[in-house]
Design a protein with these regions (language model features):
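Extreme N-terminal starter segment of soluble prokaryotic enzymes
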Residues: 1-4
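Active-site metal-binding loops of divalent metal-dependent hydrolases
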Residues: 9, 154, 202
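Loop-to-helix element that buttresses phosphate recognition and phosphoryl-transfer chemistry
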Residues: 10-65, 121-134
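Phosphate-coordination/substrate-recognition cap region in phosphate-metabolizing enzymes
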Residues: 38-107
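Glycine-rich phosphate-binding loop signature in dinucleotide/nucleotide-binding domains
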Residues: 45-47, 140-147
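Acidic, low-complexity terminal tails and accessory targeting/binding regions
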Residues: 68, 72, 87-100, 146, ...
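Short glycine/proline- and acidic residue-enriched helix-loop micro-motifs
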Residues: 107-128
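GST superfamily/GST-like fold recognition
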Residues: 154-158, 195
C-alpha cells in the first residue's frame, strides 16, 4: 500500500506567520489554490482507493481541490484524528512574537520536540499528537487497494510520519518540517512497518 500524505495549501495565517493549530483556521491563498490544482493534475492518474483529510477547513479544501482533478472520482472522508497539533495558547499568535517571548520553547518546537514543554501552553504533547494520528493510520490496515490519500497539517504530519518511520522525539524535526502543498509517500505491507518513498516533494511545480 502507498500512503500519499499532503500538507494543506498555504493560508492567510501562514502568510502572516501565525500559528494555526487545531482551533485556528484561515482560507487558502489564491496562489496556493493554483498550486493545489497543479498537484491535482500531477496526481490525476493515481487511483486512490480512499481519501481522508483533517476536518479543519484548510485541509478539507485542499483535499477537495486535489480530488476534483482526479480521473477516478472518490468521496472524501474527514476525521479529527488528522487535525493539526493542538497548541493551546500558541494558536493565533505570530511566530516572531512567540520567539521573543519563549525563545527556548520555540527553538525546541522547531528543532527538538523532546525538549518542548507543551504543558506551559496547554498544548498536546508530542506523544499525544503523534499517537492519535498513528492510531488512525494503523486502523486503515483492512483497507483494500493500493493507494490512500491523506491530507493534514505541517507540525502534526511531520512528527507523525517520522514516528511511523521509527524516529525518536528528538529526531522528528531533524530534516525540518513539511512544506505547504508537498507530497510525502510511505509504503507498507502490514501497517506496522513503513518505508519512506518520497519526502516533502513539490517538484510538480516545475512541470
Amino acid at each position: 500500500m502507498k500512503l500519499y500524505f499532503v500538507r494543506h495549501g498555504r493560508t492567510e495565517w501562514n502568510e502572516e506567520g501565525r500559528i494555526q493549530g487545531a482551533n485556528g483556521d484561515s482560507p487558502l491563498l489564491e496562489s496556493s489554490i493554483q498550486q493545489l490544482e497543479a498537484l491535482g493534475r500531477h496526481l490525476s492518474q493515481t487511483y486512490f482507493d480512499a481519501a481522508y483529510s483533517s476536518d479543519l477547513p484548510r485541509a478539507v479544501h485542499t483535499a477537495q481541490i486535489i480530488l476534483e482533478q482526479n480521473q477516478h472520482p472518490i468521496s472524501l472522508q474527514e476525521t479529527p484524528a488528522l487535525q493539526e497539533w493542538r497548541l493551546g495558547r500558541l494558536e493565533g499568535r505570530k511566530i516572531v512574537e512567540l520567539k521573543a517571548l519563549y525563545p527556548e520553547e520555540m527553538k525546541a518546537f522547531r528543532h527538538n520536540l523532546a525538549e518542548f514543554h507543551h504543558d506551559i501552553f496547554g498544548a498536546e504533547s508530542v506523544e499525544e499528537t503523534t499517537q492519535r494520528t498513528e492510531n488512525f493510520i494503523k486502523s486503515l490496515k483492512d483497507q483494500s487497494g493500493e493507494a490512500i490519500l491523506i491530507v493534514g497539517h505541517g507540525a502534526n504530519l511531520t512528527a507523525s510520519i517520522r514516528t511511523l518511520l521509527g524516529y525518536k522525539p528528538e529526531e522528528l524535526r531533524k530534516n525540518g518540517g513539511l512544506t505547504n502543498a508537498s507530497v510525502t509517500i510511505l509504503t507498507t505491507d502490514d501497517f506496522e512497518h513503513f518505508n519512506l518513498l518520497q519526502w516533502n516533494d513539490t517538484s510538480y511545480l516545475e512541470d
